[in-house]
Amino acid sequence: MNLITIISNQEYFTGKVSACYLIRMAYEKAGKEREKLRNLYYKLCDDETPLIKRTAAKEFGPLCLIMEKEIVNPEMINYFKKFMSDSDSVKVIALSSLIQLVKLFQNTDNQRLNVQVVVAASEDKSWRVRHELARIFPQLIDGFGNQINELVPTLGNLIKDSEMEVRNVALEGLAQIIRFFNTEKVSICIIPAILSVANDSTPHVKASIGECLGPIARSVGYSTFNTKMCTLFDSLMKDENAEVRLGYV
């Protein structure tokens, strides 16, 4: 405890960065010293040095998993909100903590906050934040449970994103998780999103669409699939790019 206190108050960033890691490692066995550790962590979260704040954000999710739930909400959640209104680099790192938070708040009213965070991140001005959300989206399924259907429109927006990297990552994850979605949501939100990027200029995006078609057909039924997506399937099978055609063989 004394070591963590000393290095967390050092002038140089190296000690403070190390303290972020050590607080998590020491917390479970800290007993009555836990409150002191939390206060040291909160101070690091408020540090003006970007590297220290990013390190604190990185430790946020794992630390929440070992903290008492009555501490996580509201104390830790307040800092999560601060992270998500900080610089792009901090938001990207903090966003990965959603993986832990949705599991922690599973089947509780607090899950509503996480839904709001996902929606806000999907509308963030920074494409890096939207890309990170698309990347972790498949890992949020278990924690959200049935509430994930509320976020199908959000995933549809990520598929239609203005940045190719975001579109591609969103499509890559879709094939893994579409079976968890309500069929009606897939028809209303996912299929139109895919059709809107069918003529994408990037071969990677078109190839990723190919990986989704089978799962989509199984989700909505082959009759609906043939009605809505048969033309798309045929056009991609004849695409001039060999990489795209290969994905449909």
Predicted features along the sequence, with ranges:
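HEAT/HEAT-like alpha-solenoid repeats
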Residues: 1-7, 32-45, 70-84, 108-122, ...
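Residue-level signature of alpha-solenoid helical repeat scaffolds
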Residues: 17-25, 58-62, 78, 96-100, ...
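Residue-level signature of the C-terminal ends
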Residues: 25-30, 63-70, 101-108, 139-144, ...
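Short, intrinsically disordered, charge-balanced linker/junction segments flanking boundaries
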Residues: 5, 26-28, 84, 236-241, ...
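Alpha-solenoid helical-repeat scaffolds
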Residues: 6-8, 12, 18-26, 43-45, ...
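Short inter-helical turns and helix N-cap capping residues of alpha-solenoid HEAT/ARM repeat scaffolds
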Residues: 11-12, 48-49, 86-88, 125-126, ...
